[in-house]
């Protein structure tokens, strides 16, 4: 994804403004995984959000490697790691594409040496078939592949903001034309058209969660599989900073025709306060995301 590789992309803001993942989700992955825990590779790791979380949340792996095609993202991940060297002593980062495991070395690449491969908030940019076949070539028998992501948040307590949550990212006068496709459409669809191949993986588990279900306790408890529930308390200013981490926002800012236009993220704050004047820019409100996950074990 070229935007995230741009030298002027703010990877520090990306790291600080994106949501993290709940402990109970990592516990579920721990319970799902069978066998050894020598090596975990987190592809498309970005600034190491999930990579570094897994180093703390999962039962220990001897080695964790985060890989990403963006040198900008990897640099940020390494800076964060260096801030807590003892905590992340088993973590390293490599510049590499999602389907390229050459960084393992000639004696290990395509030799079924990996115990777990994760792809977090990134698989919509991949050639999914190429990725899963490369994962198959590098995972040991019964090794875990875990793919998850999120998109299109809502403010559950403020349904009057729902149309804003469509207008800001997808409005034709705003960011809509600036998303790289088909990646964004795949993510909006929660990768429902990308399937783990049952000839390559078994014990496949898939879950989709609609953020609006948090408004309906009946629907929330009807999920047959435990959903990935990503929720966060944010101020309007913090949410605007999250908007600024979107690749479409970066592209919008780069377009000269938008030079004199009102900033989309600033407009979101202004419009939110107009609709709910009792709020301030520093009022904490809950945001919840649509999510999905796909788990499998190598045959």
UniProtKB/Swiss-Prot annotation:
- Where in this protein does the record say N-acetylserine is found? 2
Which keywords does UniProt give here? Acetylation, Cytoplasm, Methyltransferase, S-adenosyl-L-methionine, Transferase
* Reported induction: During amino acid starvation.
Q: Does the keyword Transmembrane helix apply?
A: no
Primary site of residence: cytoplasm
Which Enzyme Commission numbers does its entry carry? Answer: 2.1.1.145
Q: Where in the cell is it found?
A: Cytoplasm
Catalytically driven reaction(s): trans-aconitate + S-adenosyl-L-methionine = (E)-2-(methoxycarbonylmethyl)but-2-enedioate + S-adenosyl-L-homocysteine
Q: Name one Pfam family in it.
A: Methyltransf_31
Q: Which Gene3D superfamilies match?
A: Vaccinia Virus protein VP39
A GO CC term? cytosol
Q: Name one GO molecular function term.
A: trans-aconitate 3-methyltransferase activity
Keyword Acetylation appears in the UniProt entry: yes
Q: Per its UniProt record, what InterPro entries does this chain match?
A: Diverse_substrate_MTase (IPR051052), Methyltranfer_dom (IPR025714), SAM-dependent_MTases_sf (IPR029063)
Q: Name one GO biological process term.
A: methylation
In terms of superkingdom, the source organism counts as Eukaryota
More info: Present with 937 molecules/cell in log phase SD medium.
Q: What does this protein do?
A: Catalyzes the S-adenosylmethionine monomethyl esterification of trans-aconitate and 3-isopropylmalate at high affinity and of other molecules like cis-aconitate, isocitrate, and citrate at lower velocities and affinities. The function of trans-aconitate methylation appears to be in reducing the toxicity of this spontaneous breakdown product of cis-aconitate.
Q: Which family does it belong to?
A: Belongs to the methyltransferase superfamily. Tam family.
Task: Please report the name of this protein according to its UniProt entry.
Answer: Trans-aconitate 3-methyltransferase
The record lists the organism as Saccharomyces cerevisiae (strain ATCC 204508 / S288c)
């Amino acid at each position: 994804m070229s935007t995230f590789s741009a030298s002027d992309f703010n990877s520090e803001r990306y790291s600080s403004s994106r949501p993290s993942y709940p402990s109970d989700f990592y516990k579920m992955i721990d319970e799902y995984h069978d066998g050894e825990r020598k090596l975990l590779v987190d592809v498309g790791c970005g600034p190491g959000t999930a990579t570094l979380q897994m180093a703390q949340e999962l039962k220990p792996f001897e080695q964790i490697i985060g890989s990403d095609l963006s040198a900008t993202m990897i640099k940020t991940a390494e800076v964060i790691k260096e801030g807590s060297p003892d905590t992340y002593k088993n973590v390293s980062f490599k510049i590499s594409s999602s389907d390229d495991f050459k960084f393992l070395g000639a004696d290990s690449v395509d030799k079924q040496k990996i115990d777990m491969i994760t792809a977090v908030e990134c698989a919509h940019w991949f050639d999914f078939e190429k990725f899963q076949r490369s994962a198959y070539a590098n995972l040991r028998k019964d090794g875990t592949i875990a793919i998850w992501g999120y998109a299109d948040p809502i403010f559950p307590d403020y349904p009057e903001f729902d149309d804003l949550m469509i207008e800001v990212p997808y409005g034709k006068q705003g960011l809509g034309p600036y998303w790289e496709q088909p990646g964004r459409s795949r993510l909006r669809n929660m990768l429902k058209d990308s399937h783990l191949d049952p000839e390559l993986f078994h014990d496949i588990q898939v879950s989709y969660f609609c953020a609006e279900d948090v408004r309906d306790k009946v629907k929330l408890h009807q999920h047959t599989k435990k959903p990935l529930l990503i929720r966060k308390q944010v101020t309007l200013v913090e949410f605007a900073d999250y908007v600024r981490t979107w690749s479409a926002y970066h592209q919008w800012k780069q377009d000269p025709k938008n030079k004199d236009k009102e900033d989309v993220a600033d407009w979101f704050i202004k419009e939110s306060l107009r609709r709910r004047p009792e709020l301030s820019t520093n009022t904490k409100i809950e945001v919840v995301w649509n999510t999905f996950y796909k788990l499998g074990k190598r045959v």
